[in-house]
Amino acid sequence: GAAEGVPSPFCDCPMCNYAREHGGKDVRKRSCFRLGRNIMIDMGPDIFTQALQYGSMCDIEHVLITHTHDDHFNFTALGLMSMATHLRTTPVHFYFSEEGYRFIELLRDSEIAFGGTLRGMEKKGIYAFHKLKYFETYSIGEYEVTPIRGNHGGNMAKERSANYVLKAKDGTKMLYGMDTGLYEEETLDFMKNQNLDIWM
């Protein structure tokens, strides 16, 4: 896929035309990966269509954001969640790298984000935003989650994508490694001792 999806709305190259004609697996939406009942990785701009295709997102409690490019974190989708808050008793938790979290700090009082009401939505318990440090392990939902430093930028200066090592209760360990180039030495050193069962 690509940041604009496949087929790109404004492209008539052979690949995009093939995807339009054949559909199915050749049509690619923007990033969003559901892990079990209540964890999701990224929340791109196709979340509405993905929910239509794959079912309700009501059980989502935790969203791990890889980076703040809008094909991975489309903050306007937060508005969809806020429209159903009467059905929720707990906030949806969003997790960012330290650099990516700065994007939330900018949005909190920005008129571009729901007329400057994001901070108020936090106070009402609709959302909770968290910073994660690379290479530290956190208990999130039913997984042990370790963000590792990817090699891909984001909207903020010096932001690098967070790829995620996730360990399930049964010991299965996976790497969600989207939007990265070749890993830097620090990440490679960390990964040497990871015995992965699944690499995405």
Descriptions of predicted regions:
Residues 1-54, 129-186:
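Core dinuclear metal-dependent hydrolase active-site scaffold
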Residues 38, 43-95, 195-198:
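Active-site metal-binding motif and surrounding structural segment of the metallo-beta-lactamase
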Residues 58, 90-92, 125-127, 143, ...:
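A structural micro-motif
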Residues 10-13, 54-57, 77-81, 108-111, ...:
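Short, glycine/charged-enriched secondary-structure capping and boundary segments
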Residues 3, 69-73, 103, 182-185:
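Active-site environment of divalent metal-dependent phosphoester hydrolases
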Residues 181-200:
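Cap/insert and terminal regions of metallo-dependent hydrolase folds
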Residues 65, 96, 131, 147-149, ...:
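Structural signal for conserved beta-strand scaffold positions within catalytic alpha/beta enzyme cores
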Residues 4-11, 83-128:
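Acidic/polar short surface loop at catalytic or gating sites that assists cofactor/ion binding
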